[in-house]
């Protein structure tokens, strides 16, 4: 902006020079800026054209450095005169004009950063610059006006023509200057610019152009596609930016051309075949290397795995190890080898898929054998009891199983059991040799027949095993059958449980009919246990012990009659429960006297007051009381006859407020009063004058008064305001006679009045008028300061002014000053032609008529100028050398800032200024292969210039520490450290001594590599280079040698056997990975197999060979997959071993001895197999050591023929079997086992046997149910009887007996015996009550089926019998009589057997009272009642206690059934207990719990009563509480409730209505308990705005905290609206209607949501279009937008803001911008609101749908505050274009509004 300002200043100085009166200060008259294009004004000379070409240095953020001396294409452009306004003049001379022409061109391809935020900000500022330059206009060259014959005159024009409201009157041209779209002398005719040049229609002052034309006046020819934003439109023809071409600039040019070997498509070269590169000038290699390599100097450098001139041939892995041929990359291996590289030995028939091949030998899977794993193997070789067919055993007769190892059972046990050694072990429920028969449970207990496993029971028995007795009628399904007797369910009785039982047998007070009691007269209840009341108390009371306890409001024996409260106090009649009061009385119980009403105060003087009132009833007299409202006053009273309704109070004190009450008196009883307040009059003050007058304050003085009064009230009223909103009232104490009034508005006229105040009453006032001083502009700030320019901004004065005077100049040169006169609407001015690094002072003064403000000053310093012509001189892999031209300013040094472009921390470097015209610096310690962004600034002290920028990169660094390790005969291992720089790949080159060169690429992530296929013992030269694109690092080179091949020899054979031998050889330690041995039959070469052994082993045992067979052996070593030359040896195996003769001796019934001989060879083991000749027993097999020649065989069956087989085993070889026959001897027997003399714990056994045969007998005894360990006894061989003791009672036992002779057992004999049932023992009684008891006993040792318990009174009677299950040891005896002795007997029963009985004596307890009830409970008292015991008792013991109080015990008479409980604590839970006492007996205790009532809080009162708040206080109750319920009700019936914490003893009521009476009620709560309510009454004071219509009025009411408030639209109490008020920002009083801060709320919503509003006002929200319309239609409002992002803040304020109604689709009106965020909202002015489902924008597309938001979109937006939160994509996020652009989503945004009139300081001060 500096250049236009300089040229303009020069032109005006030349024009005005002859009229200047001299002096250093030149005054420039500057009119109000207006937006638009250049303005043409008349001039006597030829047109003067200012043609400006701007050289734009892009900011450092763009990382571009481009100097544009001229803009391409501008030379052919001609400036056209396009005035934006019409001027009606007497003379028009288009040749006499000053024309300002500005052409600013930023070629699009000047750098690739046109979309950067800094560039957008630059463009925005250039647009603003053009607007400012185009708005400059000068007055006529002479001092006279432009009117014909006008003369030079002084003064001002007080009245100017209206210009129809569409223009401003100009004294220079003596006519109206019309706004765009209007013309005519008075600007009353709509017009378009240049009448649209007849190329379009004029509609409301705007041109709608025909097709092919555009511009405001249709003067421009339209270009196709608007040149696609890639060119300028000149006369309808696109002049394309560099890099673009075509009629619409839609085609991109290729940057370097494509030569003759390609064509340009879409900005990129498409090369002809055989050429490549950006410009198609690089020839390709043959077939483009088949994409398997890189083309270097027209030769293919093939990728790994490929070779050939064009990389068209595949390389085979490891060159097939020279064991095959390589064809097209695939190895075709020689016979005996396989694998991808022929590196593996093959196996015979590939092991037939039944094994794995390891170095040529098959390792067979489980189940397969043979050299090629072709034979299936049978499990355990079928145990020689079958033969193997295809891997499966075919078993001999009598054997089965997978390996023929099991004996077979008869009929396979019919699948009903397990086969163990050929015998069936049957499953449960089956019996027989082959488990073919079903077994019945417990053999039916011999009480039925077993048919197919099921019992058919005899009569009288039931159950699965007939073990249960059957009950009559099966107990009718109402009980359990226990040993034939019914145990009835609850509620049933009778032998077969067929009868219903009544509760408690109806207490003998009624009849039991089908289980329900029919009570006798006078009794009631389910069990007739309660006394009945007359008529059931008519449902108006409770029946207690036969008497009605009536509810409140009812009376009489049966509670039928209604009662009246307090019997109407004998001054009324009770009619159906309601009092009809006598005349003069009122209230629900006629206790109140009717009060007087409508007390009126008239004729107030300084000493008297007249009173009048109304009263409809006749009373005896009236009592009038009056007392001063101040403390300490005397309360006076007098009476008035009952026939009068007026009175006069005399002898009052002047200026005192009195509280007056009038009571009605009837029969010495007072009514409630009617009251009024009145104050006597006060005198007026004197001598009001003003001592000091400032902008916002005035010093006031006045004369003192001698009378008694409280203080002064000083009122300042703004005379420009018609209502009372401009009043500022100050209350002063009595001694004061002066006051400094602050908070006034500057330049305002005030009416000042002074009043005397006494007892809150204001006397007559004394008034004067004063005008405050003008205020100066504030918040002066110098912005956008450069080395030659600065933008001065300020806040407008609060006072109404006519203009502002701006003066600026160097601070240290007082005489060098420039003064500018500005209009009152200006708030900024741009200063140019400043000197770099110079301190300037700016002064601003407000003016209105003859009034002038004090000056406001600001100081700023211009910037340093930046260094120039920054360039790179040289670079290495860690440094860059720079050079630049020095700055003009005298600086301290230069600061270099640099950082990698890819991101990272930046580094700073300070460099001294060079002595020559340039300065050079080297940046060191840089990262290799990295491009840096570099900026250089000039620095002086703490100031820094704008940067000069450049991009420069370092070279790639080479790989580090390359070394060779682990060399072998054919490989070398390489290791190195990665370069620091980022790169694409490595290139490895190695050269042999013969000069053969090999090259390959290595992946970028590698740090090691193995060179394979090298020659043994050879030295190689190796180089490694890092590459990135076409860039290469310096090479890293090293030399390495392969190892020599180790030797192998001395193969020999030793320890030759019939099936194998041992091999040994010599080799270097650690030289070989493994050795491979090939063994081959000499006479059968097909019989060959391989053995692999580890490289550290130099001998091996070869086994599994054929006996007496010659073999050839071959051995070779393996080194890293490479085989050495083989070694050979031959050998022959020995002959097979044989077994001789087998002999049997020493035969017994169960054993014999074996012996045998051998004839040839050594044996590992012998196997003996013994089979009975009938094949009935399972064969036995024994393995004997190879050194043994004898064996003892035992465990045989007596009298059995056996065949014995024996064969030898040597090295897995089994010889032919030899055999012998043997027969075992017979064994003795035992017989006739008998049982006798059974007792509860034992019995006697007897048996027969041959004498002298047995050494002893063995008895085994075990209970049949296997519940205890078996008992085993040994009896001498001469005995034939034995007594068994220590057994369980009533238990069945199994008995087994066998004889033992010489250690051998005879066949056993078996029997069954049962012990006798035992009696129970240890009878005892527990849980004894008045009608029941529990009897317990100790059971006999054995389990019984049941117990029979009988009990009968000792005095005689019918016994009761109870049958108890045998598993129980206790039962409950019921239906007992209190205090009676019973004889109790118990018998054990098992089956049909019964034990002896046991007996005991039982005494029942006393019965207790019943029906304990606590009633009439208060907070300190209660009444306990109960039903008496059935038995006669002596006394009742009553006791009660709580958790914190000791127990209180009281004895009352046995005839008493109630007791009064006194002295209780409130809200306390008590436990009440009652029991009966007779002699030494005590009944059970009857108890209940009750809780006393909660006592109420005390001393409820209202304090600190304000207009909208009041503090309620109280004292807590004695009892602990959980909450308080506070209810307050206004006089108009609005009720609110609040739950308060228990610790609270005060509460502040808010949101009250001013001047309103409230009734407050308080109730204490303790969980479900509530106390009685207490209440108080108070009246709120008045408010300035009882129903504020916006937040500004709430602020004036004294609310200073930001938060939620209720406003009332248009001040209407019936239209409340809750809003969020910002009471802090810019004076407060703002209604916030939009907030974005965290993205919690989704703003992509439909029309309905945006009309109604959504979100949380305390978080993210939208207030709603309808609410916004209603608020803004209340008056003139201003808009404020606050923006915050990462510590940065900005704001925009618009003086005028409104939103239309639904018919206009909520059209936006906004105008009058100021602020720091930039004017982005004006773009949206006049637009209707749009959502994705209601598109009201002017764009072709749906803006809301495209940008996922909603707004007053145009085409489309510059503001998108409802956009997607955090989305930085173009135009998608929360955008404010002029602050952060379209590609940045702002973190915080708020929109708010308040009345425009609120900006004056007076209103804000009044609030304070």
Swiss-Prot record:
What the entry lists under PROSITE patterns is as follows: EGF_1 (PS00022), EGF_2 (PS01186), EGF_3 (PS50026), FIBRINOGEN_C_2 (PS51406), FN3 (PS50853)
Annotated Fibrinogen C-terminal domain ranges read 1582-1797
- The UniProt record lists the EGF-like domain at 176-188, 188-219, 219-250, 250-281, 281-312, 312-343, 343-374, 374-405, 405-436, 436-467, 467-498, 498-529, 529-560, 560-591
Name the keywords, alphabetized. Answer: Cell adhesion, Cleavage on pair of basic residues, Coiled coil, Disulfide bond, EGF-like domain, Extracellular matrix, Glycoprotein, Proteoglycan, Repeat, Secreted, Signal
Disulfide connectivity?
Answer: 192-202, 196-207, 209-218, 223-233, 227-238, 240-249, 254-264, 258-269, 271-280, 285-295, 289-300, 302-311, 316-326, 320-331, 333-342, 347-357, 351-362, 364-373, 378-388, 382-393, 395-404, 409-419, 413-424, 426-435, 440-450, 444-455, 457-466, 471-481, 475-486, 488-497, 502-512, 506-517, 519-528, 533-543, 537-548, 550-559, 564-574, 568-579, 581-590
> Which residues belong to the signal peptide in this entry?
1-22
SMART domains in the record: EGF, FBG, FN3
InterPro entries to which the protein is assigned, alphabetical: ECM_Regulatory_Proteins, EGF-like_dom, EGF_Tenascin, Fibrinogen-like_C, Fibrinogen_a/b/g_C_1, Fibrinogen_a/b/g_C_dom, FN3_dom, FN3_sf
SUPFAM superfamilies tied to this protein: Fibrinogen C-terminal domain-like, Fibronectin type III
Sites carrying a glycan are 38, 72, 168, 186, 328, 603, 643, 751, 759, 1050, 1090, 1101, 1112, 1153, 1183, 1416, 1736, 1769
Q: Where in the cell is it found?
A: Secreted, Extracellular space, Extracellular matrix
* Induction description: Induced by TGFB1 in embryonic fibroblasts, in vitro.
Q: Its GO CC terms? A: collagen-containing extracellular matrix; extracellular space
What does the record list as coiled-coil region(s)?
Answer: 118-142
Q: Where is the Fibronectin type-III domain?
A: 595-685, 686-775, 776-866, 867-957, 958-1046, 1047-1138, 1139-1228, 1229-1318, 1319-1408, 1409-1495, 1496-1584
Q: In which tissues is it expressed?
A: Expressed in the brain.
Q: Which Pfam families does its entry note?
A: EGF_TEN (PF25024), EGF_Tenascin (PF18720), EGF_Teneurin (PF23106), Fibrinogen_C (PF00147), fn3 (PF00041)
Biological process (GO) annotations held by this record are: cell adhesion; regulation of cell adhesion
Pro-peptide residues, renumbered to this chain, are 23-33
> What does the sequence similarity comment in the record state about its family?
Belongs to the tenascin family.
Its function?
A: Extracellular matrix protein implicated in guidance of migrating neurons as well as axons during development, synaptic plasticity as well as neuronal regeneration. Ligand for integrins alpha-8/beta-1, alpha-9/beta-1, alpha-V/beta-3 and alpha-V/beta-6.
Q: How does it assemble?
A: Homohexamer; disulfide-linked. A homotrimer may be formed in the triple coiled-coil region and may be stabilized by disulfide rings at both ends. Two of such half-hexabrachions may be disulfide linked within the central globule. Interacts with CSPG5.
Please provide the record's free-text comment about the domains of this protein: The fibrinogen C-terminal domain mediates interaction with CSPG5.
Q: What is this protein called?
A: Tenascin
This protein's species is Gallus gallus
């Amino acid at each position: 902006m500096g250049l236009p300002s300089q040229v303009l200043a020069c032109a005006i100085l030349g024009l005005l020079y002859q009229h200047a009166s001299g002096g250093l200060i030149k005054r420039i008259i500057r009119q109000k800026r207006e937006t638009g294009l250049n303005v043409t004004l008349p001039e006597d000379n030829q047109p003067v054209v200012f043609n400006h070409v701007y050289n734009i240095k892009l900011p450092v953020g763009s990382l571009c450095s481009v100097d544009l001396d001229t803009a391409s294409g501008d030379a052919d452009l001609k400036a056209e005169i396009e005035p934006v306004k019409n001027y009606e003049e007497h003379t028009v001379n288009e040749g006499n004009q000053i024309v300002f022409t500005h052409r600013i061109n930023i070629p699009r391809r000047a750098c690739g950063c046109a979309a950067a935020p800094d560039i957008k900000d630059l463009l925005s500022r250039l647009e603003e610059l053009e607007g400012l330059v185009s708005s400059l206009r000068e007055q006529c060259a002479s001092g006279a006006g432009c009117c014909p014959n006008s003369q030079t005159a002084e003064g001002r024009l007080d009245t100017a023509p209206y210009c129809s409201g569409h223009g401003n009157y100009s004294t220079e041209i003596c006519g109206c200057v019309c706004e765009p779209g209007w013309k005519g002398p008075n600007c009353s005719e709509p017009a378009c610019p240049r009448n649209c040049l007849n190329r379009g229609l004029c509609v409301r002052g705007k041109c709608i152009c025909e097709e092919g034309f555009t511009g405001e006046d249709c003067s421009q020819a339209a270009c196709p596609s608007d040149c696609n934003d890639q060119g300028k439109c000149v006369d309808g023809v696109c002049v394309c930016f560099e890099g673009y071409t075509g009629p619409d600039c839609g085609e991109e040019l290729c940057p370097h051309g494509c030569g003759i070997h390609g064509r340009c498509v879409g900005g990129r070269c498409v090369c002809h075949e055989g050429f490549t590169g950006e410009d198609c000038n690089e020839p390709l290699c043959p077939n483009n290397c088949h994409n398997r390599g890189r083309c270097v100097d027209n030769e293919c450098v093939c990728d790994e795995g490929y070779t050939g001139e064009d990389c068209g041939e595949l390389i085979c892995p490891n060159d097939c190890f020279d064991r095959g041929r390589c064809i097209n990359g695939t190895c075709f291996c020689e016979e005996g080898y396989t694998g991808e590289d022929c590196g593996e030995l093959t196996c015979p028939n590939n092991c037939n898929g039944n094994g794995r091949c390891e170095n040529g030998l098959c390792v067979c899977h489980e189940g397969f054998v043979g050299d090629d794993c072709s034979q299936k193997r049978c499990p355990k070789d079928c145990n020689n009891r079958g033969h193997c067919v295809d891997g499966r055993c075919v078993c001999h007769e009598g054997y089965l199983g997978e390996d023929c190892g099991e004996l077979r059972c008869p009929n396979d046990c019919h699948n009903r059991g397990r086969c163990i050694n050929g015998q069936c072990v049957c499953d449960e429920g089956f019996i027989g040799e082959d488990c073919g028969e079903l077994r019945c449970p417990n053999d039916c207990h011999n009480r039925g027949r077993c048919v197919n496993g099921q019992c058919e029971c005899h009569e009288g028995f039931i159950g699965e095993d007939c073990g249960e007795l059957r009950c009559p009628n099966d107990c009718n399904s109402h009980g359990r059958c226990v040993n034939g007797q019914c145990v009835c369910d609850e509620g049933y009785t009778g032998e077969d449980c067929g009868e219903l039982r009544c509760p408690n047998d109806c207490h003998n007070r009624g009849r039991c009919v089908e289980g329900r009691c029919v009570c006798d007269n006078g009794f009631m209840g389910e069990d007739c246990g309660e006394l009945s009341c007359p008529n059931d108390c008519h449902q108006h009371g409770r029946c207690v012990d036969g008497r009605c306890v009536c509810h409140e409001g009812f009376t009489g024996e049966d509670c039928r009659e209604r009662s009246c409260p307090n019997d109407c106090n004998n001054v009324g009649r009770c009619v159906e429960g309601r009092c009809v009061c006598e005349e003069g009385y009122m209230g629900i119980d006629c206790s109140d006297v009717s009060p007087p009403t409508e007390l009126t105060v008239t004729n107030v003087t300084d000493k008297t007051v007249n009173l009048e009132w109304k009263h409809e009833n006749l009373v005896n007299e009236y009592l009038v009381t009056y007392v001063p409202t101040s403390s300490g006053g005397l309360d006076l009273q007098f009476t008035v006859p009952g026939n009068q309704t007026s009175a006069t109070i005399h002898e009052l004190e002047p200026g005192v407020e009195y509280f007056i009450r009038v009571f009605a008196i009837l029969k010495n009883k007072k009514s409630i009063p009617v009251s009024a307040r009145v104050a006597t009059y006060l005198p007026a003050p004197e001598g009001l004058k003003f001592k000091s007058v400032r902008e916002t304050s005035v010093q006031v003085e006045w004369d003192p008064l001698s009378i008694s009064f409280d203080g002064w009230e000083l009122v300042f009223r703004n005379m420009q305001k018609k209502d009372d909103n401009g009043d500022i009232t100050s209350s002063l104490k009595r001694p004061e006679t002066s006051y400094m009034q602050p908070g006034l508005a500057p330049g305002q006229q005030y009416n000042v009045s002074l009043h005397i105040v006494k007892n809150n009453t204001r006397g007559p006032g004394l008034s004067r008028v004063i005008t405050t001083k003008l205020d100066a502009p504030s918040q002066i700030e110098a912005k956008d300061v450069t080395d030659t320019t600065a933008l001065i901004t300020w806040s407008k004065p609060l006072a109404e002014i006519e203009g502002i005077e701006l003066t600026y100049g160097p601070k240290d040169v007082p005489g060098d000053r420039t003064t500018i006169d500005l209009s009152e609407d200006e708030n900024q001015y741009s200063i140019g032609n400043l000197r770099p690094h110079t301190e300037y002072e700016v002064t601003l003064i407000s003016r209105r008529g003859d009034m002038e403000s004090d000056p406001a000053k600001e100081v700023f310093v211009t910037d340093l100028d930046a260094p120039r012509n920054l360039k790179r001189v040289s670079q290495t892999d860690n440094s860059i050398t720079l050079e630049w031209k020095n700055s003009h300013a005298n600086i301290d040094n230069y600061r270099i800032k640099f950082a990698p472009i890819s991101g990272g921390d930046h580094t700073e470097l300070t460099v001294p200024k060079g002595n020559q015209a340039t300065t050079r610096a080297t940046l060191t310690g840089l990262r290799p292969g990295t491009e840096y962004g570099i900026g250089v600034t000039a620095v002086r002290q703490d100031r820094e210039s704008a940067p000069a920028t450049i991009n420069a990169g370092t070279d790639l660094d080479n790989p580090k520490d390359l070394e060779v390790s682990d060399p072998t005969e054919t490989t070398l291992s390489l290791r190195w450290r990665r370069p620091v720089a980022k790169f694409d790949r490595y290139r490895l080159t190695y050269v042999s001594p013969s000069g053969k060169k090999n090259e390959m690429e290595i992946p970028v992530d590698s740090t090691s590599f193995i060179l394979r296929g090298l020659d043994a013992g050879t030295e190689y030269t190796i180089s490694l280079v890092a590459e990135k694109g076409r860039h290469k690092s310096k090479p890293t080179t090293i030399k390495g040698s392969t190892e020599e091949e180790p030797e192998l020899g001395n193969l020999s054979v030793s320890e030759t056997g019939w099936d194998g031998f041992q091999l040994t050889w010599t080799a270097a330690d650690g030289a070989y990975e493994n050795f491979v041995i090939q063994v081959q039959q000499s006479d059968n070469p097909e019989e060959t197999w391989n053995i692999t052994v580890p490289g550290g082993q130099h001998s091996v045992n070869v086994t599994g060979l054929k006996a007496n067979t010659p073999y050839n052996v071959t051995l070779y070593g393996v080194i890293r997959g490479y085989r050495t030359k083989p070694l050979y040896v031959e050998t022959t195996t020995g002959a097979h071993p044989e077994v001789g003769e087998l002999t049997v001796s020493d035969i017994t019934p169960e054993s014999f001895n074996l012996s045998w001989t051998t004839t040839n060879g050594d044996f590992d083991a012998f196997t003996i197999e013994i089979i009975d000749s009938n094949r009935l027993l399972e064969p036995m097999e024994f393995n004997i050591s190879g050194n043994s020649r004898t064996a003892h065989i035992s465990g045989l069956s007596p009298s059995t023929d056996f065949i014995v087989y024996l064969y030898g085993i040597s090295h897995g070889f089994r010889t032919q079997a030899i055999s012998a026959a043997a027969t075992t001897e017979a064994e003795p027997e035992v017989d006739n086992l008998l049982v006798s003399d059974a007792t509860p714990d034992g019995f006697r056994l007897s048996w027969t046997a041959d004498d002298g045969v047995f050494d002893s007998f063995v008895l085994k005894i075990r209970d049949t149910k296997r519940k205890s360990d078996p008992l085993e006894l040994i009896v001498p061989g001469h005995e034939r009887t034995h007594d068994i003791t220590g057994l369980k009672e009533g238990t069945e036992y199994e008995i087994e007996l066998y004889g033992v002779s010489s250690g051998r057992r005879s066949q056993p004999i078996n029997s069954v015996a049962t012990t006798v049932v035992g009696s129970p023992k240890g009878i005892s009684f527990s849980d004894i009550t008045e009608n029941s008891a529990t009897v317990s006993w100790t059971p006999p040792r054995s389990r019984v089926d049941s117990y029979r318990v009988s009990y009968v009174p000792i005095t005689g009677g019918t016994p009761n019998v109870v049958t108890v299950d045998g598993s129980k040891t206790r039962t409950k005896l019921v239906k007992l009589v209190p205090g009676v002795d019973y004889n109790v007997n118990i018998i054990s029963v098992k089956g049909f057997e019964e034990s002896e009985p046991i007996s005991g004596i039982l005494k029942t307890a006393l019965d207790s009272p019943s029906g304990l009830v606590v009633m009439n409970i208060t907070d300190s008292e209660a009444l306990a009642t109960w039903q008496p015991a059935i038995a006669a008792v002596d006394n009742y013991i009553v006791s009660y206690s709580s958790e914190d109080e000791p127990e209180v015990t009281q004895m009352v008479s046995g005839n008493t059934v109630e007791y009064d409980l006194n002295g209780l604590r409130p809200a306390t839970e008590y436990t009440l207990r009652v029991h009966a006492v007779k002699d030494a007996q005590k009944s059970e205790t009857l108890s209940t719990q009750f809780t006393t009532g909660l006592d109420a809080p005390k001393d409820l009162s209202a304090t600190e009563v304000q207009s909208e708040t009041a503090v309620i206080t109280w004292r807590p109750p004695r009892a602990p509480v959980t909450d308080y319920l506070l209810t307050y009700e206004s006089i108009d019936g609005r009720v609110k409730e609040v739950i308060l914490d228990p610790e609270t003893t005060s509460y502040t009521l808010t949101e009250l209505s001013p001047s309103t009476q409230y009734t407050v009620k308080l109730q204490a709560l303790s969980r479900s308990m509530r106390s009685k309510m207490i209440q108080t009454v108070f009246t709120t004071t008045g408010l300035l705005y009882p129903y504020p219509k916006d937040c500004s009025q709430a602020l004036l009411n004294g609310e200073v905290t930001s938060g939620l408030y209720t406003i009332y639209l248009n001040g209407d109490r019936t239209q409340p609206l809750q809003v969020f008020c910002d009471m802090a920002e810019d004076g407060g009083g703002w209604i916030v209607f939009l907030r974005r801060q965290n993205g919690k709320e989704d703003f992509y919503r439909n029309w309905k949501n945006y009309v109604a509003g959504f979100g949380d006002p305390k978080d993210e929200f939208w207030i709603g279009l309808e609410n916004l319309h209603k608020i803004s239609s209340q008056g003139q409002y201003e808009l404020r937008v606050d923006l915050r992002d990462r510590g940065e803040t900005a704001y925009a304020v618009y003086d005028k803001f409104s939103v239309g109604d639904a018919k206009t689709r909520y059209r936006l009106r906004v105008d009058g911008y100021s602020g720091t965020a930039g004017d982005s909202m004006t773009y949206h002015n006049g637009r209707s609101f749009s959502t994705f489902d209601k598109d009201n924008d002017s764009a072709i597309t749906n803006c809301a749908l495209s940008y996922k938001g909603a707004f007053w979109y145009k085409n489309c937006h510059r503001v998108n505050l409802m956009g997607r939160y955090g989305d930085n994509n173009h135009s998608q996020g929360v955008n404010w274009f002029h602050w952060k652009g379209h590609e940045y989503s702002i973190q915080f945004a708020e929109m708010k509004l308040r009345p425009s009139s609120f900006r004056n300081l007076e209103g804000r001060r009044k609030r304070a």
